[in-house]
């Protein structure tokens, strides 16, 4: 028996006619890293909630088929018991954090305390996960004083501290900057190597292609495919299904570069190998055209010597200077850099 089995799973929310999940079947083993993709409304979040018993125990409705986790039926096992095996991380950390604790340390320890984990073990687990997710320096801060990305890492740490055997992540990097996203993917990959089964719902196809062992493709509640990233992203119908493949794959489609098995590469390393095999291919880099710079427009927005801090010991802006004209301007920076505060 596989560690997780989904057999002909069907589900319809109350007061609706359309199935949110329509005959889903697949298996997963310990330590597999599986991505779940599909356009909005495909059933991704509903499926993840079925893994941990929220569907149908909390979200009522018409339920059929079976989800089994290590021999335990997810639909009938109390969620309080099932959460020891299956951890779910929401897209929005506001929906995950308890609000009952004033510090990051206490928030991450909250679930462990509820299950009566000894204090010594709690300290060991918290030391581990807070360093893993690079939030050790925030351990004495209130979680709701952190940026969105930092809060998400606290939410992830709270679940990881429970040491689940299956980890479900519902777009966990949606509020993280590129560096934070890479850290989360790398951390989750390491967790998979320790034997934790990972299911990650994501829109960042490049990341999924690089990290996942398999990908589950859903469309309008139906299972379209369950296969390797190379085979999934080589499908000719992805655009019709609302999926944009990784840039590397799109490039290889244009250049007619293939892997030995006939699929398109999804990683840069595979592209290099494909280029070596295709001696006739000629790859040309785009040339920068001569650009005539127009005279800079007049400034319409000026910031001079801006100073601001939420607390006395943590300034957000210190002698900040900025001049803008009518041209569009992007504001970028790591989580906590001050982007939202400036806005």
PLM ranges: what are they?
Residues 37-39, 332-334:
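The feature captures the beta-strand-to-loop junction immediately N-terminal to the Walker
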Residues 109, 113, 120-138:
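Conserved ABC ATPase "signature" region
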Residues 142-146, 150:
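Conserved ABC ATPase signature
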Residues 163:
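Conserved catalytic motifs of ABC-family nucleotide-binding domains
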Residues 202-203:
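H-loop/switch region of ABC-family ATPase nucleotide-binding domains
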Residues 167-170:
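Catalytic Walker B motif of ABC-type/P-loop ATPase nucleotide-binding domains
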